[in-house]
Amino acid sequence: MREPLAGTQTLIEAKGVSFAYGRQPVLEDVDLEVRAGEFVALVGPNGSGKSTLLRVLLGSLDPSSGTVRLFGEPPSRFADRARIGYVPQRPVLDSEVPATVEEIVTTGRLARRGWWRPLHRDDHEQVGHALDSVGLGDLASQPLNELSGGQQQRAFIARAFAGEPDLLVLDEPIAGVDAESQRRFRDSITHLIEEHGAGVLLVSHELSAVASDLDRVVVLKRRVVFDGPPAELAASGVSLGVHPEDLPLWLEELR
């Protein structure tokens, strides 16, 4: 088992980040930081720039201005990508690849351990735990391309869990899943943070399952309009830019 990360270590950091598609600004002067052991939620209305910000933070897009650091390095220089587990909202799957769910999840473990190192008993156990954490243990031997879109996304979440990343970045990972799957998801997040000191950045509209575990909530509307503990958001009067009846249940519960 590897040593937990130091709680003061900054895993991902953005300073003064702006981004535009052509002349259309999407992000404006965004500051964001996630440290080891932190569980941070990124929320905001549709079109607020959340998914774009994730892509900028991870180096898929270059900011128009400002700086980004992954583990202290510019994304273009950060080579140890196995330290990061990233699950986009809509993972891209090659339908011609006949891999099973378990095989796909195992690649997450291999990426972290080293592709040419044999897997040991604890590695296979971690893959099994990851599958169970997203409710796919019974479907481990099924071809991934035969699963529904939601099940495929859960398989990629399990792949990220199997690698026990130092930084976990998730874009809408629990939309539409049942309460039991949400509980398992929460337990896996808690394990990563408590046992390994991992940092977690979560984009989601459905945070009721994890609201009590969050350290910070960041509200994005092209720029950061709030960054602080969930309870302070409920008292701050910051609007998420949606109709009151559409406010997430977790926010209502904090009032």
Predicted regions and their residues:
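Helix-to-loop junction immediately C-terminal to a conserved catalytic motif
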Residues: 58
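Conserved ABC transporter NBD signature motif
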Residues: 66-80
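Conserved ABC ATPase "signature" region
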Residues: 121-139
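Conserved ABC ATPase signature
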Residues: 143-147, 151
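Conserved catalytic motifs of ABC-family nucleotide-binding domains
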Residues: 164
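Catalytic Walker B motif of ABC-type/P-loop ATPase nucleotide-binding domains
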Residues: 168-172
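H-loop (His-switch) and adjacent beta-strand-loop-beta switch element
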Residues: 216-229
